[in-house]
């Protein structure tokens, strides 16, 4: 584990993105990280889509190394996205479900699990009878088990796009099956919804480790792979067992901290004011 880095003691070496300590160290991604590492100490300020209360030890350590670490998020609270049409009737369907009972599944706009994992997840959803909303690209639906859509239409919806922010903030949501992209994690925190994590690349493994072992607001799939039994177990733990209740308590605490950070006297609002003052002062200096 990364014991030498404050706030990272539960992070394992294998959780780091490829191109940092292993993998192709000559890749464009690795070179970008290297160049970023050289530039950050020279920056007048480093902006983060986060809030100080989420990782106070990490933020404090970064502030000791760089000029100004300014947490000015979560962006989805600071500048909420405009409402979108409920094309598929998601919200009306959610209104009919019990509180904290629905699984929402989305792996972002870039990655999709391989076919055998899609099958495993579909089988888990069918066997568990958990109400679900699944945002799945049209070209991936061919990998679902034959007859799955018909057999689950009474308790689930599969759609090609979903209004994620609105869904995660609905009272019926009980768990978010996610790729652990940073925006999705913040949206889940703001919605107060625990997560089942299936990371793919970049910072996603590290994010998933934070979710499970540091913040204790979700579960990582064993080996980072979706299996039928693993998915059923994860759904049961979060939706039906005491462990899930504790996760909901933890994430609701973070939700309140996130909201507080974006209040007029909150940490993120103060950081944004500091950023504005910095920009004005440098503009005056250059003039």
Swiss-Prot record:
One Pfam family here: UDPGT
Record's keyword annotation contains Glycosyltransferase: yes
Binding locations of an anthocyanidin: 202
Gene3D superfamilies associated with the record: Glycogen Phosphorylase B
Enzyme Commission number, as recorded: 2.4.1.115
Alphabetical GO biological process terms: anthocyanin-containing compound biosynthetic process
Keyword Transferase: yes
Keywords tagged on the record: Glycosyltransferase, Transferase
UniProt-listed InterPro entries: UDP_glucos_trans, UDP_glycos_trans_CS
Tissue: Expressed in cotyledons, hypocotyls, roots and leaves.
Annotated GO MF terms: anthocyanidin 3-O-glucosyltransferase activity
Pathway in which the depicted protein is active: Pigment biosynthesis; anthocyanin biosynthesis
Reaction catalyzed: an anthocyanidin + UDP-alpha-D-glucose + H(+) = an anthocyanidin 3-O-beta-D-glucoside + UDP
Domain of life the protein comes from: Eukaryota
Chain residues that bind UDP-alpha-D-glucose: 162, 164, 179, 182-184, 187, 203-204
Group of enzyme by EC: transferase
Coiled-coil portions: none
Described function: In the presence of other necessary color factors, this glycosylation reaction allows the accumulation of anthocyanin pigments.
Family recorded in the similarity comment: Belongs to the UDP-glycosyltransferase family.
Protein name: Anthocyanidin 3-O-glucosyltransferase 7
Source organism of the structure: Manihot esculenta (Cassava)
Record gene name: GT7
């Amino acid at each position: 584990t990364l014991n030498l880095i404050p706030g990272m003691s539960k992070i394992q070496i294998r959780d780091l993105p490829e191109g940092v300590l292993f993998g192709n160290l000559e890749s464009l991604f690795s070179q970008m990280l290297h160049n970023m590492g050289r530039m950050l100490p020279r920056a007048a300020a480093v902006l983060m889509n986060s809030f100080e209360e989420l990782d106070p030890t990490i933020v404090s350590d970064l502030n000791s190394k760089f000029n100004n670490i300014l947490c000015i998020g979560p962006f989805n609270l600071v500048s909420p996205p405009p409402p979108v049409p409920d094309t598929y009737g998601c919200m009306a369907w959610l209104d009919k479900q019990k509180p904290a009972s629905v699984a929402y599944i989305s792996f972002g706009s870039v990655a999709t699990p391989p076919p055998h994992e899609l099958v495993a997840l579909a089988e888990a959803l069918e066997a568990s009878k958990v109400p679900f909303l699944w945002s799945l690209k049209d070209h991936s639906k061919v990998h679902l088990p034959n007859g799955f859509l018909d057999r689950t239409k009474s308790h689930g919806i599969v759609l090609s796009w979903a209004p994620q922010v609105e869904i995660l903030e609905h009272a019926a949501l009980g768990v978010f099956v996610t790729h652990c992209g940073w925006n999705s994690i913040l949206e889940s925190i703001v919605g107060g919804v625990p997560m089942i994590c299936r990371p793919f690349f970049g910072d996603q493994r590290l994010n998933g480790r934070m979710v499970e072992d540091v913040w204790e607001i979700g579960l990582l799939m064993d080996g980072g792979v979706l299996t039928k039994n693993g998915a059923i177990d994860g759904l049961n733990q979060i939706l039906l067992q005491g462990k899930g209740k504790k996760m909901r308590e933890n994430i609701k605490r973070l939700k309140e901290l996130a909201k507080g950070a974006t209040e007029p006297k909150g940490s993120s609002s103060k950081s944004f004011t500091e950023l504005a003052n910095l920009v004005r002062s440098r503009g005056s200096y250059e003039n």
